Amino acid sequence: MHYLIWPLVKFLVAFIIVQVIVAAMNWIERRLLGLMQARLGPNRVGSEIGIPWGLGQILADPIKFLLKEDIVPSSAEKVAYYLGPMMSILPALIVFCLIPYGPPPTFAPTQVNVGLLLILALTSTSVYGIILGGWASNNKYSLMGALRSAAQMVSYEVPFGLSIVGVLMISGSLDLVKIVRYQEMHVWNLFPQLVGCFTFFVAMNAENNRTPFDLPEAESELVAGYHTEYSAMKFAFYMLGEYSGMLVNCCLFTVLYLGGWTLCIAEWGITTTSLSKLGIVGGLIGAAIFIAKVMAIMMVYIWFRATFPRFRFDQLMDLGWKWMIPLALANIFVTGIILLALPAVEVGGIWHWLGEVILSIAGAAIIAFTLFLLTRTAKPARRIPAHAG
């Protein structure tokens, strides 16, 4: 019986943790955007009862969604209309149960040999909730947003998956815990897999429909995109799905490229072995390190939103098919050549560090060359001819 109860407990714990973090993320994002745009952001709610810095906004938002009127279009396909928001958030919650956020076994809830492959399969299903909601709303703006989201997901799922192949080649495993342990014995994959890291970050922004890739819900073009006809808690589920997807991608980025819950390398830093000797205290230390890295990636997410304007749809497709996919393939090619050229030696040997350095330099060179080509091949701005009269 416990085989049925234990997964359910994990899912409920993941749901509670994710929703608390998502609520805090929303407040942090609004405050940081306020600072970046030379304004205050939410800083008043809760001050009457002694809650500082506007932190009461974290509680005010869910209360607002609970109390708002729930309007359902009369022409909507009811079953699909209600399924859309739920299917949008469910994959992120399941994936969160698979990500190790601390040293095993306590802080790695489910260790799967093909965990990374399973995560890629699950994250790609979140688009079905968007497509269902857009189609079932029986609204032209919603349908257009859903179609945009489908095209965007197809375009960026390819570089999203290809960017991870380099990590699999050097670590030799699909198990996320083993990938973290490889990094603590070598060096963070951020350095030897610089191109894959760059491609992965761009692709995960696009998969989450975040600015500058937010064309499925472009307010200036499609009112609110696929969730135009949603209100109250159904709209909140779509918002939670977006932020939960952001959180999952930041966790995945931390595991794949930033060494997970470890610091530095085995000879000097905090490793899985050293944390395991401290028991639950070591687990909490590892989880705190992991959360700090995730929050750092989240800050970059927000920085991107505040910095870059929205792409046109043709620019979005060009970036995915003409630049990100070739970049990811080049990373796989270079990684394979270096792994074949250099012999397998012990950790810390001259050949080991030579391979890491060559991969890092090659990655930086590829990114620099790509940025140079982008500036040389940029399309001229479209100009409207002057009125003859």
Predicted regions and their residues:
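Selective transmembrane helix interface/packing segments
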Residues: 1-389
